[in-house]
């Protein structure tokens, strides 16, 4: 009897242990099934979100397309556009475009810089010496003396006066011109003219004078 009771007790204990072992297995199965359901639900949620996003994009494209169609070119005539132009149309004359030669600001700036860097050399002018016009001395010729018809005493007093040479004009030529003029000057032949005496008549004095064809350019002193 004791053996049977012990066997029953052992069997009960084993049965309890088996039940305890079966409970975690069910829990594991339930957990695994719950995880699968969670993943399935997540997949459904993602699919739903992707469908919503795709629907929103389609709606935006539908809104953009009619706006682009309204902006398209509208031709006034319903017929097709001819690809080739008719031959009767004369060719268009192209008017030549005239560009004024304006300097660009960059080029102007470069030219100004060049002028500032390399200034032009100013040539010094040669000094101009004052040149006085040559004054011809108004000398009386034989015809002038005859045409004067002066009285005899006045003419004698004028004849007795010794000739006074005029003061020479003051010139300041360069040294080179002065040297050339001095080297090329020829000696003037001096003729001895007899000085008229007081008792000599005018007609005798006029015989000694040579006829002068033109005005004398320079006063020459009379050498006695």
Swiss-Prot record:
Annotated signal sequence is 1-15
* Similarity annotation: Belongs to the beta-casein family.
Q: Which residues are reported to carry the modification Phosphoserine? A: 30, 32-34
Name of the protein this chain belongs to:
Beta-casein
> May I have one GO cellular component term?
extracellular space
What task does this protein carry out? Answer: Important role in determination of the surface properties of the casein micelles.
Principal place where this protein is found? Answer: secreted
Domain of life where this protein originates: Eukaryota
Disulfide bond residue pairs: none
In terms of InterPro entries, this protein maps to:
Casein, Casein_beta, Casein_CS
Which UniProt keywords are listed? Answer: Milk protein, Phosphoprotein, Secreted, Signal
Q: List where in the cell it is found.
A: Secreted
PANTHER family, per the entry: BETA CASEIN (PTHR11500), BETA-CASEIN (PTHR11500:SF0)
- Tissue specificity comment: Mammary gland specific. Secreted in milk.
């Amino acid at each position: 009897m004791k053996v049977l009771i012990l066997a029953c007790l052992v069997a009960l204990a084993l049965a309890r242990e088996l039940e305890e072992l079966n409970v975690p297995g069910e829990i594991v199965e339930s957990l695994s099934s719950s995880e699968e359901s969670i993943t399935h639900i997540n997949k459904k949620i993602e699919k739903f979100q992707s469908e919503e996003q795709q629907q929103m994009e389609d709606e935006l494209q539908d809104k953009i397309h009619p706006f682009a169609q309204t902006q398209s070119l509208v031709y006034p005539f319903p017929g097709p556009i001819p690809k080739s132009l008719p031959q009767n149309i004369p060719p268009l004359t192209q008017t030549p475009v005239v560009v004024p030669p304006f300097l660009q600001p960059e080029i102007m700036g470069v030219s100004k810089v060049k002028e500032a860097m390399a200034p032009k050399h100013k040539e010094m002018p040669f000094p101009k010496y004052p040149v006085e016009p040559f004054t011809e001395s108004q000398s009386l010729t034989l015809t002038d003396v005859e045409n004067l018809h002066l009285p005899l005493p006045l003419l004698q007093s004028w004849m007795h006066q010794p000739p006074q040479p005029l003061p020479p004009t003051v010139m300041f030529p360069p040294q080179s011109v002065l040297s050339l003029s001095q080297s090329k000057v020829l000696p003037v032949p001096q003729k001895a003219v007899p000085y008229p005496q007081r008792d000599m008549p005018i007609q005798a004095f006029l015989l000694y004078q040579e006829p002068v064809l033109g005005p004398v350019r320079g006063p020459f002193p009379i050498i006695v």
